[in-house]
């Protein structure tokens, strides 16, 4: 999904499900000059999923954890000194279209995401997983 927009991945680190290690990796990514930071894994409501806590522990301002969009309800968006730090739910790895598709263009354009923006996605926030996908020429993400 990043390649479509010509994005270059300049930092990648695999972490255990340990908040301190994830926090350190996020801060390391920021120090490396990443303009967008994405975390994957550990985003559900399971007590063992620690990524939201790790993002919070960076000092990032959490805009929202949770979205009225399927797939992608467990999405987290925050800002760490102006750098977006997003917790991506597992669906971004397997679903054709998710909340990530709706928000990535805005993140790349440095268009700040607000809690109100996320709430507005509730109208049109259900991807119907059509056999032949016509997104963005469908109702998904359009309110």
Per-region residue spans from a language model:
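Non-catalytic beta/alpha edge segments that cap or flank active sites
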Residues: 1-143
